Amino acid sequence: VKGRQVFDSRGNPTVEAEVFLDNGISATAISPSGASTGAFEAHELRDQNKNKFLGKSVNNAVENINNKISSKLKDLNSDDQSNLDNILLKLDGTENKTNLGANATLAVSLANAKCSALSNKKSLFKNLGKSFSLPIPLMNIINGGAHADNDLNIQEFMIRPDSANNFMDAIEKCFIVIQNLKKLLQSKKMLTNVGDEGGFAPSINTNEEALELIVQAIEKSNLKPGKDVVICLDVAANELLNENGEYSIQSKSFAPVDDVINYYKKLTSNYPIKSIEDPFAEDDWNAWKKITNTVGNNVQIVGDDLFVTNPKRLDKGIKEKSANSILVKPNQIGTLTETLEVISMAKKANFKTIISHRSGDTEDTFIADLAVATMSSQIKTGSLARSERVAKYNRLLRIEEELGNQVKMAKI
């Protein structure tokens, strides 16, 4: 196993691992990195040496692969993924991968899974799962919050093409809406440059203004808002909380939880919003329970920072009915085996699973195969712009072609 420092889509250093087998097969995997991260995520190890890439270099994580991990994995069978991941867990010995770094363990774990597939002469998704479906994309089209330099508080406004017959159709519906949104923004003399995840980041002041623009773009595309294409939000409320437990979601001023819930109710009745991710902060369990109880029958309530792909936190959320869906980011937990365990736990509880990229992503397309292999209903991997996002869509199109008529779109 070899580690090296490479770069993500923001130009920040990140970790790549390359696994070599004795049959001559090798494969690489790269860890992504988030901007709005949950406090309970597995630890991303950076050197913190201000003289090297302003503290962002990952030489320690790379050295952990080359000096600590590599020797422990000698003579392992690459098909024994859970054994390999267990060795990584024991070697690290902490709750959240503080010693080795989740960026080191994940890169090794995923590179091994790719080697196993190559050895078995199978596509990665076929090596990971037995039954398959193609996920419906949640495509980011307007950015705010930590992903943009505008006044929008909600971090992501996304579209989901619910009436798509196949994956190419899903992409086409999103493409048409994006092109129409671009024309609308241009007609209003607004900027159409894109944010970290490929969505537009125009200087819009209110959530409602963004939602109106998206509805108009859907209608201009001869599609029905709420039927053909629905709107999904990622509020990233962790970033919008003050010390009194109030949130600045509606505007710059802060409001208590009950007012925020009423605001969400108003938005979901006025606009075709079918999914809200991180509507409240990661420790505000009561607020989560309230919102799920209030709108959860018609709206997907998605835990990202709440669950951080962690089985203990998901277990609490299932018991307390805090949400009805989970965002799955392998780098929040740090190994493939633990990621698969979380997906399986969520499915048993009838939670929807949404496989997700990070805002600092790379050309690695592992999550596309993961979404298909786990029959996850949705994938969240940015807009139809920037190669690190489009790479995932292109991979899903190849998978759709490989499976042919045997595969259907997942059911929401």
Where are these regions (language model features)?
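Short, Gly/Pro- and small/polar-rich lid/capping loops
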Residues: 1-15
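Metal- or metallocofactor-binding catalytic centers and their adjacent structured scaffolds
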Residues: 32-118, 122, 126, 171, ...
